[in-house]
Amino acid sequence: SLYRISETALKNLPSKASAEIRIADEIDTILLDAYPFNTQTDTVDLPAQLKLTEPPDSTLQLIQFVGPIKSEWLQAVEETGVTLVHYIANNAYLIWSDPTSRARLDILPGSHSFMQYSSVYEPYFKSGPSIRTRVLQQKDPSEVVRVTIQIYNHDQVTKSQQIIDNLTLKEIVPWHSILSYQNTTVTVLAGDLATIAQLPD
């Protein structure tokens, strides 16, 4: 069984009960390649160039449950109107939300004990190491960079595709579908990488 208890309650448990308990604080950590963090203890501190100042109308969002995910929890999340995109360890999901569904979703952590974290999926999380370095160092905005871009395939995806196409210097691999995503490989200017990362999908 999985229980959340305070430090005080843990210290006051009988020694026999304490010996049988395994503290599983790793389940609170979302294992993003770019920025693993504990949703209950860590402060997410991201550079301004790769951080949203405010969420777009519709955007990718990151949520985390209190433990191993149950089907009824996913159902409750879907009933807010969001779309489940894919699972992320530990006990987290990437979702697609609009303002209406996001407002409903924001109520869940307070009214349901199964959700403990909900926030926009920041541009920093989407970007590979070499892209982050170029955006943050801003050494040569005119550098031509080869990138593979993956965006969530929603009903307004062509808007983001058009922005990317307008920034493309050379198309290497045309747009194509893989699971829930549209993918392409192109060359762009390093100075345009932040603009692409800031796209909502």
Locate each region found by the language model.
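Autoinhibitory N-terminal propeptides
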Residues: 1-201
